[in-house]
């Protein structure tokens, strides 16, 4: 069962001209969800990427990152929208495919030198992922790799992230469609 075939495409959401790739159809299917987590688990057990912690980006990055943390025996750190974390935070603004936003992480989330796998559901412009990477680095962490279910290479985020020197991995690409 290809992962791509389980992802719903919604035109003109959240605004006209955007083709939204909805992973809820993938993760509601227990076979599809297991395939995602098993595929990522296998990659990180076998590929030699060294990391200590998983950092997941709100909200869908929590779903994938939490399950992956469990299967790999790693801790999980959330990157959240403003006002959702109870202790002292560091913030980072960023641009989206369809606007701008801000995310936060606890100031004490990572110890200096902690290597992290940064996880989210989808890579489009790269703005959210780069903002999360900046947060990880602000609190002393090091991004070992970024992992996504879906990559939209035509939007340019993959190249932008690679140009900044980060390694990325995605399970499937939606190119030109």
UniProtKB/Swiss-Prot annotation:
One of its GO terms (cellular component) is cytoplasm. Pathway: Purine metabolism; AMP biosynthesis via salvage pathway; AMP from adenine: step 1/1. Its main location: cytoplasm. It holds the Pfam family Pribosyltran. One of its GO terms (molecular function) is AMP binding. SUPFAM superfamilies: PRTase-like (SSF53271). It is found in: Cytoplasm. It is an enzyme of class 2 (transferase). It comes from the Bacteria. GO terms for biological process: adenine salvage; AMP salvage; purine ribonucleoside salvage. It catalyses: AMP + diphosphate = 5-phospho-alpha-D-ribose 1-diphosphate + adenine. Its EC number is 2.4.2.7. Keywords: Cytoplasm, Glycosyltransferase, Purine salvage, Transferase. Catalyzes a salvage reaction resulting in the formation of AMP, that is energically less costly than de novo synthesis. PANTHER family: ADENINE PHOSPHORIBOSYLTRANSFERASE. Homodimer. Belongs to the purine/pyrimidine phosphoribosyltransferase family. HAMAP family: Aden_phosphoribosyltr. This is Adenine phosphoribosyltransferase. It comes from Chlorobium limicola (strain DSM 245 / NBRC 103803 / 6330).
